[in-house]
């Protein structure tokens, strides 16, 4: 799922979790490994909690519950107050710290690989038309 639009200024600090607030994707949780401009969504970033990756996994695990929070027929909405009211068992602080210590490198690697994929796709999109039009040879 791609953002509907981009902004040249971020209002969050990576890593960032967004939960879509309205529309067909209301309740969809996404993790960004870059600063983003969060709009029409609920979000948590590294300034909100040091346990962003734990919260992200928790939200993904509670996807069915998030989907059930949608209100409204024509334009579904998921409100922050409803997300905050989800029943959740929070592990002790030491367990959260351990989870973050061991999980962070994996999530950071995922972020690096996503950025590489993005750059490779851009290269492909620039080079393929030139290759097809015989502007370059290999």
PLM feature spans:
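Amphipathic alpha-helical coiled-coil/heptad-repeat segments
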Residues: 49-50, 61-76, 81-138
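A short beta-sheet element
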Residues: 1-63, 67-84
